[in-house]
Amino acid sequence: AEPAPRAVKQAAVRKLSDYYDALWHTLATPGERQAPGKWTPAQGVNTLGDPMEGAWWERRHYWRRMSIEELKRGPNRTGAPAMDGKWTVVSAKTEGITPGFVILDRHKRRYFVKFDPPSNPEMATGADQIAIRIFYALGYHVPENHLVRFGPEMLELGPDVTVQDRLGHKHKMTSRDLSEILMHVSTGKDGRWRATASLGLPGKPLGPYRYFGVRADDPNDVVPHEHRRDLRGMHPACAFIDHDDSRSINTIDVLADGP
């Protein structure tokens, strides 16, 4: 396993531009290339060349065969948002291919609710349920993602919720704003919406991580990401399931208090 983590005194929240990141590192500073006939060994490994358990990865199915029930359950432990009470909308996402919002259930648990594209019902939510279990079995840290179906009676707006319009202007969110978001989401024959409810991770979100370099504000992050065996191992896994959206912008670093 990795050495015991050192305390992180201050860690900045990082925001990345997907377009800038792609253009800069494609045209300005392309990544390291292996010399002909040579290869660059992976780092962040033990004496046997295996990745070490820790903040990035841990041993699961390959080292200890998981049961069918464990594989089906994946990372899910807490459960889906409670259906016997209102979901309070505390923020909303209007940009991107699919809209979404953040809710608190009656237990005050935070979930990120994401929908399918209107043209492809069940596509994103179904693929997510499969992929999250594959990566969990491979040993990666993934969030709890639950498949939910709900109707408009489940939702209520929280106080002082703001939303951003197409011009980037923010205003207090109204019931009409919520209705306009949901107008772009397909419903089933029963009139309910199908979505993924992703449980908020414990700790302080620090934004996405990069697939190269290290975080200067994290004394535990000492192995360049492009040479980490666990991150290198993600490449064939993503290729296997055709996960072409596994970019930095879709990752997250979290500053956790416990192990």
Spell out what each predicted region is.
Residues 3, 83, 115, 217-220:
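General secondary-structure edge motif
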Residues 11, 15-18, 22, 126, ...:
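Extracytoplasmic/secreted proteins, especially bacterial periplasmic and envelope-associated proteins
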Residues 1-91, 107-108:
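Regulatory N- and C-terminal appendages and interdomain linkers associated
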Residues 3, 7, 11, 44, ...:
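Short, well-ordered helical secondary-structure segments
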Residues 26-37, 67, 145, 150-160, ...:
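Generic marker of "main functional regions" within proteins
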Residues 73-211, 242:
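Conserved ATP-binding subdomain of kinase catalytic cores across diverse folds
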Residues 123-128, 209-259:
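Conserved kinase catalytic-core segment
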